[in-house]
């Protein structure tokens, strides 16, 4: 009987030890198993088997929330709904659409998190360790982007002085059925294609929530340089097993015959008031800022001067 009791204790311990040795020491799964061992339970092993929702596959964007922005695009000077601070507003006002013709920027990929709102399909694939079968990373690819790795093995983010890229450095973890992604080390880039930008100090958190064949992506940009408070957006995708991510070759050509870098000097952009004039809005309200995000700002708008609407139509 004593030998039977010892076998009941020793065998689970050996099994748990084998599992622990088969995964990297820094992995989330390994840490979960270790906590289960310390508590005298097998909870860690069960967590490894049940903590993830499968997000892999081909997805097509459903831009219901951003149909105007992703159609003809936001007008110059339209910063509605963006919590820009003074520095972010100044950066946006220097924007010149001619920069897209620069050879250095023609093949620039959409940055995180703007790439979620780009047109076309999106592919999520899994990188799995062939021995432990542990999920090492998700890889996300869009029509116009580089491969984006989202590391799931618990590795730390690099130091502040590490290189910044368009996709940054991303790590993920599951909270219930939601994949939560944290991204740092991003290059300065646009958050709306008419000028508003995030700085290279921005930190982006994303929540991927799957409901059957639909995937909701919520993005949260925290930028101490250009934003007064976090900028939050969401976008939807639909699972599409009968599609394939299309090939998108990018060839750089000399489109810009100008001898200058396209930009506007502070206070010298003549087109900034056109949006307010054409839509009958107070110019101050179109400048963005955290205050403009909330419903009670409507009462303040009633006290503002509105420029008479001009008949000129938007391009």
Language model features with spans:
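Bacterial N-terminal signal peptides
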Residues: 11-22
């Amino acid at each position: 009987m004593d030998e039977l009791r010892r076998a009941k204790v020793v065998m689970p311990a050996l099994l748990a030890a084998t599992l622990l040795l088969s995964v990297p020491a820094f992995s989330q799964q390994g840490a979960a198993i270790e906590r289960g061992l310390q508590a005298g339970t097998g909870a860690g092993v069960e967590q490894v088997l049940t903590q993830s929702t499968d997000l892999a596959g081909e997805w097509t964007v459903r831009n219901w929330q951003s149909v105007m922005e992703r159609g003809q695009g936001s007008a110059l000077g339209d910063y509605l709904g963006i919590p820009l601070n003074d520095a972010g507003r100044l950066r946006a006002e220097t924007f010149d659409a001619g920069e897209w013709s620069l050879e250095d920027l023609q093949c620039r990929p959409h940055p995180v998190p703007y790439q979620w709102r780009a047109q076309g399909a999106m592919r999520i694939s899994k990188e799995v360790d062939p021995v432990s079968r542990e999920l090492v990373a998700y890889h996300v690819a869009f029509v116009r982007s580089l491969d984006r790795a989202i590391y799931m093995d618990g590795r730390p983010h690099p130091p502040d002085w590490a290189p910044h890229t368009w996709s940054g450095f991303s790590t993920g973890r599951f909270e219930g059925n939601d994949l939560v992604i944290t991204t740092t080390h991003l290059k300065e880039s646009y958050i709306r294609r008419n000028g508003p930008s995030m700085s290279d100090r921005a930190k982006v958190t994303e929540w991927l929530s799957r409901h059957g064949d639909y995937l909701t992506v919520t993005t949260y940009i925290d930028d101490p340089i250009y934003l007064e408070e976090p900028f939050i957006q969401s976008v939807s995708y639909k699972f599409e097993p009968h599609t394939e991510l299309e090939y998108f070759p990018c060839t750089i050509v000399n489109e810009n015959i100008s001898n200058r870098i396209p930009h506007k000097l502070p206070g010298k952009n003549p087109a900034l008031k056109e949006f307010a004039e054409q839509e009958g809005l107070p110019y101050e309200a179109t400048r963005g800022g955290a205050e403009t995000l909330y419903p009670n700002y409507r009462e303040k708008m009633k006290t503002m001067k509105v420029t008479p609407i001009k008949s000129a139509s938007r391009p």
